């Protein structure tokens, strides 16, 4: 669920998904193409692949239970789809935290027209 994913990103990075990640590079936000431009964009690419493997796009709107305590995110019990989407979001938020030192403000609001080259494959 996008609102829950935003909260996970905020918990891990102390940055709001909008504006910092919603349009970052070639893969953060809706869709994605070409090569992942930076470590944070790779986190978004892997997140897109995870969503693709886990469930249909409709599952991305499922509300899932999770907890943030003692510096860690944990997914709670839910339907199979909710648990899969929660794990995709949790892993991506942790990846974004690990890539904070390589965050490039020049990739914020990156235009799709600059996303060139062959697309990554999952």
UniProtKB/Swiss-Prot annotation:
Its cofactor is Ca(2+). CDD domains: PLA2c. Ca(2+) binds at residues 27, 29, 31, 48. Its EC number is 3.1.1.4. It catalyses: a 1,2-diacyl-sn-glycero-3-phosphocholine + H2O = a 1-acyl-sn-glycero-3-phosphocholine + a fatty acid + H(+). One of its GO terms (cellular component) is extracellular region. It comes from the Eukaryota. Keywords: Calcium, Disulfide bond, Hydrolase, Lipid degradation, Lipid metabolism, Metal-binding, Myotoxin, Neurotoxin, Presynaptic neurotoxin, Secreted, Toxin. SUPFAM superfamilies: Phospholipase A2, PLA2 (SSF48619). Coiled coil: none annotated. It is an enzyme of class 3 (hydrolase). GO terms for biological process: arachidonate secretion; lipid catabolic process; negative regulation of T cell proliferation; phospholipid metabolic process. Binds 1 Ca(2+) ion. It is found in: Secreted. The active site is at residues 47, 89. GO terms for molecular function: calcium ion binding; calcium-dependent phospholipase A2 activity; phospholipid binding; toxin activity. Expressed by the venom gland. Snake venom phospholipase A2 (PLA2) that may display neurotoxic and myotoxic activities. May induce inflammatory edema by mechanisms involving mast cell activation and arachidonic acid metabolites. May increase plasma creatine kinase activity. PLA2 catalyzes the calcium-dependent hydrolysis of the 2-acyl groups in 3-sn-phosphoglycerides. Monomer. Belongs to the phospholipase A2 family. Group II subfamily. D49 sub-subfamily. This is Basic phospholipase A2 LmTX-II. It comes from Lachesis muta muta (Bushmaster). The lineage of its organism: Eukaryota, Metazoa, Chordata, Craniata, Vertebrata.
